[in-house]
């Protein structure tokens, strides 16, 4: 009625609640202890069909409540020393990580499409053009680009190591970083027929990454630069991320509006 498009974000395999309630679904180390991230939060096993069903049923509930889209986040394998020694319970040479992630999203997508719901996957921006990152987290950009309806690479400049894209500090170069990342996306997905290709809707940085050496403050200017980079790469959609949900309205103004505001100050 109000022309608002609703998206339900569901965190997938980093799930300490499910891991505690169903320990047999938790991803474990050889000593039987759960695999946890840097904050001590447990992960469940992305190979387990019971986990797929749980995540699909959660999404179906959201669809029944009226959400237009399901956005699966943390739809990947964990990283770190714990993850490297985890017991996944399968022959990972015969069934690699990337296939498990693709199979889960196809499984959930089939069910959710029956309810008329759009299915989106959040992925690391660094998987674009990096086979090493693909193998680590199990997110294959090209494969997922023809599995889900929309794909959202997290191309936050702060998440690229200094020197990437030939930039001394990517975080200090928001336009150049996002443009390079999105041009990489265009190149990687170009062989997929347009009718079969996912919509690309990148996550953009709406926060200041104080932990990055050489970082800059992110305000309206930096947000607008990233948005322009998306457009200049040939894409039309984008979303912003700030973990505290504090967003700068200035970043959403058009060039004419910014100029008017500056003239009125």
Label for each model-derived stretch:
Residues 40-76, 136, 140-147, 229:
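An active-site-proximal structural segment forming one wall of the substrate-binding cleft
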Residues 1-11, 80-119:
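Aromatic-lined substrate-binding rim segments of carbohydrate-active enzymes
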Residues 1-34, 69-72, 114-116:
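Glycine-rich, aromatic-flanked loop segments that form ligand/cofactor-binding clefts
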Residues 15-38, 78-92, 139, 172:
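Aromatic- and acidic-residue-enriched segments that line the glycan-binding/catalytic groove
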Residues 11-15, 75-77, 124-128, 156-158, ...:
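Active-site beta-loop-alpha junctions enriched in small/polar residues
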């Amino acid at each position: 009625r109000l022309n608002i498009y609703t998206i339900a974000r569901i965190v997938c395999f980093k799930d300490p609640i499910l891991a505690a309630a169903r320990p047999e679904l938790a991803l474990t180390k050889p000593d039987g202890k759960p695999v946890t991230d840097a904050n001590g939060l447990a992960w469940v096993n992305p190979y387990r069909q019971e986990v797929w069903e749980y995540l699909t049923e959660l999404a179906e509930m959201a669809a029944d409540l009226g959400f237009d889209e399901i956005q699966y986040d943390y739809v990947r394998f964990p990283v770190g020393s714990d993850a490297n020694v985890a017991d996944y319970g399968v022959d990972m040479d015969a069934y690699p990580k990337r296939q498990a992630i693709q199979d889960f999203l196809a499984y959930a997508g089939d069910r959710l499409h029956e309810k008329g719901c759009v299915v989106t996957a959040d992925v690391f921006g660094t998987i674009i053009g990096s086979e090493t990152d693909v193998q680590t987290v199990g997110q294959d950009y090209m494969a997922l680009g023809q599995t889900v309806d929309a794909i959202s690479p997290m191309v936050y400049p702060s998440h690229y190591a200094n020197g990437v894209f030939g930039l001394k500090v990517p975080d200090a170069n928001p336009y150049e970083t996002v443009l390079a990342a999105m041009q990489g996306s265009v190149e990687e997905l170009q062989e997929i027929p347009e009718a079969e290709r996912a919509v690309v809707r990148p996550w953009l940085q709406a926060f200041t990454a104080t932990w990055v050496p050489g970082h800059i403050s992110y305000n309206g200017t930096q947000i607008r630069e990233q948005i322009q980079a998306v457009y200049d790469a040939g894409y039309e959609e984008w979303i912003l991320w700030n973990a505290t949900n504090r967003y700068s309205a200035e970043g959403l103004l058009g060039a004419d509006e910014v100029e008017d505001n500056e003239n009125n100050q």
